[in-house]
Amino acid sequence: MKENTFDIEKVTYSMKEERFVEALSSLEFNLASQPNHFECLYLAAVCSRYLKNYKDAQNYLDRLLRVNPDMGRAYQELGHLNRINGKMRSAIAYYRQACELNPALIASWNYLFEYYKKNKNKQAADHAAEQIKKLQSIPNILLYISQILNEGKLAIAEEKCREFLKKNPTNTYAMSLLSDIADRLGHFDDTEILLENAVKFKPEDGELRMKYALILRKKQKFKETMEQVNILCEKFPDNLSYQAHRASEVMQNGDHEKAVK
């Protein structure tokens, strides 16, 4: 059975219906012919965890990480397994690693927030809360696209992102995601156009404008970059990161005295 003929959506639907035995049976059948199928190994681990077959779940994750060591969702699953087994310190380390590899994993952020809050680490808790708030505001399909994009599945991410934008042409988060894909593929003109339009739709979004400034910088449009950074500093005068970017741009343009003011 070829990888692209296996019906992952049917399996995930079974899992949503909590028919984990049925889903796992389908996954194991496919793994017999495709033992290194990333998604099958991951979903088999999830099914095994829900069925409380924790040793099997660990074995699936071990196999998965041998062939795909940078899959954030796998580390999130390791976090779940360690948390269930009472190994909270290890669980937090895995959740943190999951978020570093894939910042769109809201479950990991939730557990990190609860842990940091309980341990009175306000700065870390506030950061986790900010990420959770951002992710909760995103439609589920865009959250999924973010996750697969972070796993390097550019073709699928682009296809689904374009489908979403056809129905929601002014959604700036989707435009930003598509710009990330274009940037990774080296299509810098497309990246610039997408971010330019996104900034027009949402001019008060500092993160969007910063991304726009960075692609302008990458394309060596120094004057336009400086214009965007100046706007950021005017709109967000207390943001030290934006101030640092402006100083860097001034230095790049040769005005050293102005940069240190």
Where are the model-predicted features located?
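Helix-start (N-cap) detector for alpha-helical repeat units in TPR-like alpha-solenoids
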Residues: 4, 38-39, 72-76, 106-107, ...
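Alpha-helical segment of the N-proximal tetratricopeptide repeat
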Residues: 5-33, 43-50, 140-167
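Register position in tetratricopeptide repeats
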Residues: 16-17, 50, 84, 117-118, ...
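Structural marker of alpha-solenoid helical repeat scaffolds
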Residues: 33, 67, 101, 134-135, ...
